[in-house]
């Protein structure tokens, strides 16, 4: 078993398996345009929790497939414009509570948090139809709609938009920031997944966002005869192929003792990013909320560099 130092050293240069599809950028530009159009029409319901610091509302907006999305919005009560954190939650967990999200108001931030729709959580769903048929493509579409909603809010400082998420939400934070380019100021992700689908499969990761791969290669393609076709479709929703397009600053936290989101795949997404970036790894932490990283996030949002740079 490798030492922590040896593991870190090997991960620092790992870039994952496979190549970015040639039409990846144009594919997501088209979908982003559709997401932006959806965000232009929404209905907000104000909640009775307003206080001296913040006002709360739930916004309903149709996604690119016409299905309704619910998005939580917290607006600081002090005069704007305000920076905003666009939040995405992990697989199997709901959006964070209003009380938790209100902490960002202390830093002067508003919050826009997508309540992700129910879906199968099988990343292979729809693969036979190519990237347009993937259920996870729609998940990313939904995330883009929520980001465009944030950009459209009159109190938001459009020059200080942050994407942030954990686990699946971490990958969505990277994906959205990559598609929006210069429109995102900061991007932070903890234990982001999925990324490096083929690498995760080859390494035997079969939990979380990768669980569908095990089922697929047991029930649908037991000899892996069509593996290349599957991974060609999944390349369009792979955070590892979004990250090279990032133009924001990037902060990533990785629990090295993670048996749900492959540390190697997380590093692959980070290592392919060419923007200003920092990664903090935690040898004895797994796929869980890491308090130390949340402290680093606080500093990242407070416009200072993360004070650790170990990878």
Model-flagged regions — what are they?
Residues 246, 252-254:
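Short beta-strand/loop motif that positions the catalytic acidic residue
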Residues 96-141, 199-200:
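Cap/lid segment of the alpha/beta-hydrolase catalytic domain
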Residues 256-261, 288:
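Acidic catalytic loop of the alpha/beta-hydrolase fold
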Residues 71, 75, 81-91:
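Short beta-strand element of the alpha/beta-hydrolase
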Residues 267-311:
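C-terminal catalytic histidine-bearing segment of alpha/beta-hydrolase fold enzymes
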Residues 127-167:
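Gly/Ser-rich "nucleophile elbow"/oxyanion-hole loop immediately N-terminal to the catalytic nucleophile
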Residues 175-224, 281, 289:
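Hydrolase active-site cap/lid region
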Residues 1-54, 310-311:
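N-terminal targeting or regulatory segments adjacent to alpha/beta-hydrolase or S9 domains
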């Amino acid at each position: 078993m490798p030492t922590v130092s040896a593991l870190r050293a090997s991960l620092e240069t790992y870039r994952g398996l496979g190549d970015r599809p040639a039409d990846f950028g144009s594919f997501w530009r088209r979908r982003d345009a559709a997401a932006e159009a959806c965000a232009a029409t929404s209905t907000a319901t104000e909640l009775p929790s307003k206080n001296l610091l913040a006002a709360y509302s739930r916004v309903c907006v149709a996604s690119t497939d016409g299905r309704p999305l619910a998005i939580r919005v917290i607006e600081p009560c002090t005069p704007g414009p305000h920076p905003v954190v666009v939040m995405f939650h992990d697989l199997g967990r709901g959006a964070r509570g209003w009380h938790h999200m209100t902490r960002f108001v202390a830093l002067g931030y508003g919050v826009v948090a997508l309540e992700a729709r129910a879906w199968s959580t099988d990343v292979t769903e729809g693969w036979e139809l190519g990237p347009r048929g993937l259920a996870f493509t729609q998940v990313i579409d939904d995330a883009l709609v929520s980001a465009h909603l944030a950009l459209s809010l009159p109190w938001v400082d459009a020059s200080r938009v942050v994407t942030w998420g954990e686990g699946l939400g971490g990958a969505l934070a990277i994906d959205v920031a990559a598609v929006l380019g210069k429109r995102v100021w900061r991007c932070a992700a903890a234990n982001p997944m999925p990324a490096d689908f083929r690498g995760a499969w080859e390494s035997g990761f079969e939990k979380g966002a990768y669980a569908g791969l095990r089922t697929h290669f047991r029930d649908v393609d037991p000899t892996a005869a069509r593996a290349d076709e599957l991974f060609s479709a999944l390349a369009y929703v792979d955070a590892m192929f979004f990250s090279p397009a990032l133009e924001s600053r990037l902060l990533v936290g990785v629990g090295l003792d993670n048996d749900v989101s492959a540390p190697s795949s997380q590093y692959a997404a980070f290592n392919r990013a060419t923007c200003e970036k920092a990664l903090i790894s935690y040898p004895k932490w797994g796929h869980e909320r890491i308090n130390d990283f949340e402290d680093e996030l606080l500093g990242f949002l407070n416009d200072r560099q993360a004070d650790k740079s170990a990878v």
